[in-house]
């Protein structure tokens, strides 16, 4: 069977799909991944075959436009203004950019690029003839090619956030700039367009899917390639002295601005506690941390799935990848969300009892210290996190899901005859 994956230009949003790709290939099926050019190398390193026929996306610009518009409307929670939507550089005045003007001036270019991407995806799919399409939430081409070919398409969630969740503004539900669905005689893309959803979440934090059919699967963490550090197996087992992992996304800093980077506040908060701290950040964020107190270590790039099982708590931005890896490790989470899907993910996990959530803008060192103390000292959060890990482990593994997907494809083929 041939299975087409389509992915957006955000690696952390398709990482959760990688183990399913492995399982399909191990079962003898063919997998191709239609992607933008920047994703070809990370997909190849993940062991999947990229087809880089899509245009480079401008999701970063659209996401920053959303933040800028929030500032114009008085909804921006941080003291400093958001970065310039196009350049990503700091600004000192909201007069530096006008979203409506920019979108008006660039709509034709956005539509042309979107048309080239959707046309290329449909053209490849028509030639290759997959029997299933699997895609992430930001991929417009996935549901489109499934509808055009008349084969099932499945939305693969990256965490406890789905098509009916939150304020689905720019950067979350893909925008059909070229009206590709209409050009192919289809109804416009809406949350109800998604008929099948692959959900790797524990039942306790699974998002509502509307009328879509849920296909549960056990989450197998994949955080990108890496090397196991030689010091990692020598760490004392969790519990001898509390160990806290601090993770932050460089992409989040780029979208919201360097002034929103909370790790220095987290360092100040944790310095007063008797804990060991492991900090993993990348890029320019490393330069923003400064000198660390004793007992804290700034790590080189380390796959999170190797690190979290050795920790008692993780502090992060509420992204799906961090959240799901922590759920798989069975450890409590403190989530400092900025926006987009982060607040929904953080609040959903906090409501389950497996962690605490607070807006990053309100997270001063005292609040962070109090939350970390509660999560480390209260066994209820730890017990709930372990229960959610058991829920996750009880889900069908990717190999079992492959069997179900084969049945879905066969049923669709029979119905089409």
Located regions from the model:
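A donor-sugar binding/catalytic signature common to diverse glycosyltransferases
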Residues: 21, 299-348
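Donor-nucleotide binding loops and adjacent catalytic segments primarily
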Residues: 218-313
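N-terminal subdomain of nucleotide-sugar transferases
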Residues: 1-57
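Conserved nucleotide-sugar donor-interacting segment of glycosyltransferase catalytic cores
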Residues: 93-94, 98-183
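A nucleotide-sugar donor-handling region in carbohydrate enzymes
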Residues: 36, 175-252, 282-285
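Conserved nucleotide-sugar phosphate-binding/catalytic loop shared by glycosyltransferases and other
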Residues: 33-98, 102
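C-terminal amphipathic helix plus adjacent low-complexity
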Residues: 370-417
